[in-house]
Amino acid sequence: MKNKEHYEKLERMYLNARFNTKIYDTTECSIEHEKAEIGLTISDKYFHALGAIHGSVYFKLLDDAAFFAVNSIVTDVFVLTTSFNINLIRPANQGKIKAVGKVKFKSRNLFVAESILYNEEGKEIAFGTGNFAKSKVHLSEEIGYL
């Protein structure tokens, strides 16, 4: 399989996941070698009491971007997040936000990736670093890899 086909299958798997079609329905995804971009349009359904997006949304986008940056180079199995640290810099309450994930380290069993979340003006609003490992779950049609 060519890399482009692998990236497109990962994108479809991600965008068709029930979590994204039901809750994060404006999600966009682009995957290439050791890099992934995950974005969405902010909606008030993601807001906490102070009228800005909840930290869980920051985490989701940062983790997903780093995760798919890693899975872009793992072509046989699904990877797993083993740990992830985030830093929230500023709030966001309108427009589009985009997380850009990149692989920083890779070995046979451990991967480290970082991601940065940007607001619509291109300002950094959060960043994170995660550790990832290969699972025993093969990439297949059963998990939406088509």
Where are these regions (language model features)?
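Terminal targeting signals and extreme-terminal segments of soluble enzymes
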Residues: 1-146
